[in-house]
């Protein structure tokens, strides 16, 4: 089926390929990716954009000793194909299948695991310094996108390696930023001579000789100032040069000859160097080229039409976005903040209708939280929409800048609970634990999509920090639950009365608990169902009443058990000297792999059958 790909066996096979063969290979890889991802889902556009870049890196470097770190990691599919994992792509992102991100236990060619952005340069600097301490000899390459480069961690790492002159090669995969008009022929010429070792040696020798005399030193400094002024006008990489990192580029990221040539020369430069590569997301697939956001991370789709196979449904993200627009229409103090996740968090419509009150700060969660605190301190009602897994990056800002001052920031925590196919780095199963430990923080969760609107409207009217957590997708199992429309701080909703057993469920697990209740009635077990709308503070009055009536408690949450709501309930019952039995159902103290959500629930006994079995044994 594929002339080159079918016969490719080892990372060294690429070394002797001609430019024409590499171009044909690139075409085959694109066809392979489109075919496979259309059947499994995955990150398509970003991988189509780095085919030539990845081939060039593999051709120039010796992957049996050199280390490539892929920032974020979702653009590493081509790397996986070239490192012996082509035959596993039918299982991409499936349970026990090929991960969508680099995994050290998956291949010796995955030097470092990634998933969150802006980490690659820091990791590369650590690996490079370990190499130098051990007196080893290999290259360390960090591949980072223009979006990830906006992250504070990436800038911190650049500052460090530029100052310390750490020998690291950085590939800036730029698929979005525009290049100013003055970056043209002059820039190309300057890059050409800066790549020439004779030029670099001559420049160093001239400066050394000039500095031997007082007059020469002044001349040398003047030349440096003049040269710096010219470069400032014509070279977009001046920022990198100023902090001590050699800048090369920009170059065409789809021109294999130019890529291999410049990468080879970058390899010879001592000290940190950044190569600016211009690529196109979705390259080679017209639908992805026209709509790269849609194909950034997509489910199964028809490769001939580009249309998704599953029909879109009402989701929590859409409900949140709709609620934000409605609230903003009635309250000009409401502002929305996102960290480069406008589409994912459902804020597209808000950004268009209220551009002055919409802030996309880039991949800067720490900055986003403290900026929200500043807005709240001056009378505005900031809502920070963020994935659960990414809010982890701003824990100190939540604690130090928001909660100590008890500022009314609303955290709209999307993708809470397990998210499935993206695996360990993206499962949102820690937010209850890390937020419940912070004084002045209130945590809420809607039991259904429809309830989120009412919670958001209530939350923005309060004068203290509130986190509202909700899952990926839409209603879990049942869509017949009526949303709670009025809330009292720290009070739960009793959905069903019962005997002997009280199930306290959080968020989407409430719908699951309702189905479990119906199943358990067949075994003569009549459970009360409590919707823990407030995770913190817990409803102590309701707990006390059920405890005094000698109920056993079953707590179901989509969070790790350590520090979850079950822990809060146990702590309260212990403080009150109650002896009621408590069964906590949640996730173990381990990182949760990738796979279909229902398969993962079954793995942890959080599917309907598993929950029923645990309660029957407990009863």
Swiss-Prot record:
Key words of the record: Isoprene biosynthesis, Magnesium, Metal-binding, Thiamine biosynthesis, Thiamine pyrophosphate, Transferase
InterPro entries: Dxylulose-5-P_synthase, THDP-binding, Transketo_C/PFOR_II, Transketolase-like_Pyr-bd, Transketolase_BS, Transketolase_C, Transketolase_CS
Cofactor(s) it depends on: Mg(2+); thiamine diphosphate
SMART domains per UniProt: Transket_pyr (SM00861)
Pathway given in the UniProt record: Metabolic intermediate biosynthesis; 1-deoxy-D-xylulose 5-phosphate biosynthesis; 1-deoxy-D-xylulose 5-phosphate from D-glyceraldehyde 3-phosphate and pyruvate: step 1/1
One annotated GO biological process: 1-deoxy-D-xylulose 5-phosphate biosynthetic process
Catalytic activity as recorded in UniProt: D-glyceraldehyde 3-phosphate + pyruvate + H(+) = 1-deoxy-D-xylulose 5-phosphate + CO2
GO molecular function, one term: 1-deoxy-D-xylulose-5-phosphate synthase activity
UniProt-annotated binding residues for Mg(2+): 146, 175
Gene3D superfamilies linked: 3.40.50.920, 3.40.50.970
Keyword flag Ligase: no
Assigned GO CC terms: cytosol
EC number annotated for this UniProt entry: 2.2.1.7
Cofactor note: Binds 1 Mg(2+) ion per subunit. Binds 1 thiamine pyrophosphate per subunit.
Binding locations of thiamine diphosphate: 74, 115-117, 147-148, 175, 285, 365
Family to which this protein belongs: Belongs to the transketolase family. DXPS subfamily.
Function recorded in the entry: Catalyzes the acyloin condensation reaction between C atoms 2 and 3 of pyruvate and glyceraldehyde 3-phosphate to yield 1-deoxy-D-xylulose-5-phosphate (DXP).
Subunit structure: Homodimer.
Alphabetized PANTHER family for the sequence: 1-D-DEOXYXYLULOSE 5-PHOSPHATE SYNTHASE-RELATED, 1-DEOXY-D-XYLULOSE-5-PHOSPHATE SYNTHASE, CHLOROPLASTIC
The name this protein goes by in its record: 1-deoxy-D-xylulose-5-phosphate synthase
Species of provenance: Clostridium acetobutylicum (strain ATCC 824 / DSM 792 / JCM 1419 / IAM 19013 / LMG 5710 / NBRC 13948 / NRRL B-527 / VKM B-1787 / 2291 / W)
Name of encoding gene: dxs
